[in-house]
């Protein structure tokens, strides 16, 4: 592997680690980069799980040390996600691209509405969050989705934790990272068994994710909810613009890769 490709993998990993820890959608960058570098989409999707696992492991350790969420709640919500994750990974069919775009667009709109009108929503500060039975069903479906697509799962979790469970955005991000960390090894194992992991790409990119996640999770408390809200809003708007065709993240990133290489 050429040194400049290695640098690109690590640096992009740092950026993705920061984006995913504070908001979500970083996997769009990762998968786009991997395919631009020549990996088949299925291998790119599988290889992405290495970075996802390492990044969420790192952020989870930091969030636990800082006491930013209730660990019991995290484990309870992880159980249906794990079950759904295994089922989703074993499903042979893939979701129709048009259906995916519609669903992803709805999730982005929900997040946008929350970020704009959150002052009118009664937020439950702290860790005394009440988990309702239907929340487990939602997390089961989220786990299924994450098992075979993954891209955008962070926004699905944020949509439920912010809008329905009424968590503050810092706690919601901590729960999001923990749940994804617990569930990812199950889908990662499926991709490993099927030989759809490129370790030469995945490990350097994963190391970058660790660095970015350490940075973001460490300073999340100091930056405060206002900064995280603004950061999330910017990322969501970029993803939404890409989704409706105002910009093309794939074309932009591919052009950058062409210049660098």
Residue locations for each model-derived region?
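Residue-level signature of transmembrane alpha-helical entry/exit and packing/kink sites
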Residues: 5-9, 73, 77, 101-104, ...
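Hydrophobic alpha-helical transmembrane segments in multi-pass integral membrane proteins
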Residues: 141-151, 187-195, 202, 240-254
